Amino acid sequence: MNFMLLSAALASMAVAGPIAGTYPITYPSSNTPATYPSGNAPIWSSPIHGGNNGGNGGNGGDNNGGNGGNGGSGGGNTGGNAGNGGGNNGGNNNGGNNGGNTGGEGGNGGNGGNGGAPVELCPANRVPQCCQLSVLGVADVTCASPSSGLTSVSAFEADCANDGTTAQCCLIPVLGLGLFCSNP
């Protein structure tokens, strides 16, 4: 019902036409009500107020993100995030540059150390031999060199045992003869 009354009031104003007389409007320099010349004030003569001033614009977040550091291996990180935009319309926020160049290749590992000193299967000046022993425990006439690549005295003894011979360290192995032999 209120809507209908308002519609009727507006319609009657439109039909009535303009109000006689002119009313120059002066805008105050502050928010004080406007004044009108003597006579009837127009219907819309409530104090005129200008709209509030728009708020201050925010700071334009023009901070650029930092550059990524140089990576030691695998390249640096990309630049940091740009600063936040201030106010309604932030400034141009640029992300940082791509990460720095990748670091140099890692150095090559050093060479492995040499193996230990060669294994001495027999004391100095003695030659390893696999010999058949006589009944008295003295080396028989048949001796032969053990397999190559033996790495311990126990491997030397096992190698000779596989052939049914005994590991011996001989002073003079000549033509398959074991002379002056002893146990390793």
From Swiss-Prot:
SUPFAM superfamilies recorded: Hydrophobin II, HfbII
Disulfide bonds: C122-C169, C130-C160, C131-C143, C170-C181
Origin superkingdom: Eukaryota
PANTHER family associated with the record: HYDROPHOBIN
Taxonomic source organism: Passalora fulva
Induction record: Expression is down-regulated by carbon starvation but not by depletion of nitrogen. Induced during invasion of plant tissues.
Alphabetized InterPro entries for the sequence: Cerato-ulmin_hydrophobin (IPR010636), Hydrophobin_sf (IPR036686)
Keywords: Disulfide bond, Secreted, Signal, Virulence
Record note on disruption phenotype: Does not affect the hydrophobicity of the cell surface.
Biological function: Aerial growth, conidiation, and dispersal of filamentous fungi in the environment rely upon a capability of their secreting small amphipathic proteins called hydrophobins (HPBs) with low sequence identity. Class I can self-assemble into an outermost layer of rodlet bundles on aerial cell surfaces, conferring cellular hydrophobicity that supports fungal growth, development and dispersal; whereas Class II form highly ordered films at water-air interfaces through intermolecular interactions but contribute nothing to the rodlet structure.
The name this protein goes by in its record: Class II hydrophobin 6
Gene Ontology cellular-component terms listed: extracellular region
Quaternary assembly: Homotetramer. Further self-assembles to form highly ordered films at water-air interfaces through intermolecular interactions.
